[in-house]
Amino acid sequence: MRVCWLVRQDCWHQRIKLPHLEAVVIGRSPETKITDKKCSRQQVQLKAECNKRYVNVKQMGVNPTSIDEVVIGKDREMKLLPGQVLHMVNELYPYMVEFEEVAESPNVTQRKRKRPDCDSQEMEAEAGASPSQCSVSPKTGKHGAAKEESLGHWSQGLKISMKDPKMQVYKDDQVVVIKDKYPKARHHWLVLPWASISSLKVVTSEHLELLKHMHAVGEKVIADFTGSSKLRFRLGYHAIPSMSHVHLHVISQDFDSPCLKNKKHWNSFNTEYFLESQAVIKMVQEAGRVTVKDGTCELLKLPLRCHECQQLLPSIPQLKEHLRKHWGG
C-alpha cells in the first residue's frame, strides 16, 4: 500500500499525511505552524492520488499559492508531483510530497520510505517556469545515477534553457552553466550538476568533489565573462530553493536588474538565507551534510537593508536608487 506525506522543507520534522483520494484542507493553523495572516485558514485543498503518485492542489485562499513558482490561481487546480515545490502563500512556506510504500503482514508492518524523487531532475531557471508534460533522457554521472524520468517532472522553461545553446555558457561531463532566466543582477548564472541531486538536504560527503568542481566552474565563468571588471561576485546556494535540484548561484553584487522586484528576491541573496559556496563545502567536509536551521524562510521577511552600508530602505525602488550611489550609476 502506498501513502502520501506533505513535508515542510524549512521545518524538517513537519509531515502531514494525505490519505488516498481524500480532500485535505490546510492553511494557517497550529498543525502547519503558519501564523502569517496572508495565508488563509483554508488556503489549499489537497487530494492525493497515491496510485499515480501526484497530489491535486486547489488554491482556495485569495493570496497566491504556487508550484515551482507557477501561481495556481484562486479556485483553480494544479498537480503537485514528487520533486516539485509547493509554496503555500506568497512564495513562502515550502512543501514537497513524499510517497511511502507500506508493506503489511498479519503481525508486523514494515515501512520503506522513498525519497522525494531526486531522480526527477527538476532544476531551476529561477522563476516563472511552466510545468512540462515531456520526458527527457537524463545524463548519468558518478555522483548520482539518473533513473528514467517520470512524465512531467521537468519545468518546461528550464528544460528549454538547459538544451538551448543561447542559454548555456559552459558545460562539461559533470555540470552545465546557464544564464538565469530572470537575473537578479547584471551577471547571474546557475551552475547545475547533471547528477540527480534534489536539494542540499540530501547532499553528503559523497558529493564533496562535485561541490568543489561546481565552485571552480563558477569562478571560471566569472573570469571568462567579466575579465577585468571590478564587479564583486558571490557564489552560493539558497538554503530553501524555490525549485528542486541543487544549483549554485553565481551573481554579481550590483543587483542592477529589472527582475529584482520584491523583498523576497533581495533577502534571498542578502541574508543568511544565501549560503556561501565555500561554507557549504566546509560544512560537508566537516559534518558530511548541510544543516539548515528551522525558520530560515522567515529571513525572507526581514526589512530591506543595503548590503554595502547596512542602511534600511523602505521599498525596492528606493533601495535600487540607493544602490546606484555605491556603483556610481
Curated annotation (Swiss-Prot):
Q: Extract one GO molecular function annotation from the record.
A: chromatin binding
The Phosphoserine modification is found at 120
All residue ranges annotated as the HIT domain in the record: 155-260
Q: Where is this region: Disordered?
A: 106-149
Q: Name one Pfam family in it.
A: zf-C2HE
Could you list this entry's UniProt keywords, alphabetically sorted. DNA damage, DNA repair, DNA-binding, Hydrolase, Metal-binding, Nucleus, Phosphoprotein, Zinc, Zinc-finger
What reactions does this protein catalyze?
a 5'-end adenosine-5'-diphospho-5'-2'-deoxyribonucleoside-DNA + H2O = a 5'-end 5'-phospho-2'-deoxyribonucleoside-DNA + AMP + 2 H(+); a 5'-end adenosine-5'-diphospho-5'-ribonucleoside-2'-deoxyribonucleotide-DNA + H2O = a 5'-end 5'-phospho-ribonucleoside-2'-deoxyribonucleotide-DNA + AMP + 2 H(+); a 3'-end 2'-deoxyribonucleotide-3'-diphospho-5'-guanosine-DNA + H2O = a 3'-end 2'-deoxyribonucleotide 3'-phosphate-DNA + GMP + 2 H(+)
Q: Any idea of its EC number?
A: 3.6.1.71, 3.6.1.72
Catalytic site = 247 (tele-amp-histidine intermediate)
Instruction: Name the residue ranges of motif: Nuclear localization signal.
Output: 111-115
Gene Ontology biological-process entries: regulation of protein stability; single strand break repair
Q: Which InterPro entries match?
A: FHA_2, Histidine_triad_CS, HIT-like, HIT-like_sf, SMAD_FHA_dom_sf, Znf-C2HE, Znf_C2H2_type
Main subcellular localization, coarse class? nucleus
Q: Where is the FHA-like domain?
A: 23-72
Which ranges of the sequence are coiled-coil?
A: none
Report which superkingdom the organism of origin falls in: Eukaryota
Report the stretches of sequence that form zinc fingers (C2H2-type): 304-326
Question: Which portions of the sequence form the region Interactions with ADPRT/PARP1 and NCL?
Answer: 1-95
Instruction: Spell out the subcellular localization from the entry.
Output: Nucleus, Nucleoplasm; Nucleus, Nucleolus
State if NADP is listed as a keyword: no
Its quaternary organisation is: Interacts with single-strand break repair proteins XRCC1, XRCC4, ADPRT/PARP1 and p53/TP53. Interacts with NCL. Interacts (via FHA-like domain) with MDC1 (phosphorylated).
Q: What does this protein's UniProt record list under function?
A: DNA-binding protein involved in single-strand DNA break repair, double-strand DNA break repair and base excision repair. Resolves abortive DNA ligation intermediates formed either at base excision sites, or when DNA ligases attempt to repair non-ligatable breaks induced by reactive oxygen species. Catalyzes the release of adenylate groups covalently linked to 5'-phosphate termini, resulting in the production of 5'-phosphate termini that can be efficiently rejoined.
UniProt domain comment: The histidine triad, also called HIT motif, forms part of the binding loop for the alpha-phosphate of purine mononucleotide. The FHA-like domain mediates interaction with NCL; XRCC1 and XRCC4.
What's the protein called, per UniProt?
A: Aprataxin
UniProt source species: Rattus norvegicus (Rat)
Q: Which gene does this sequence derive from?
A: Aptx
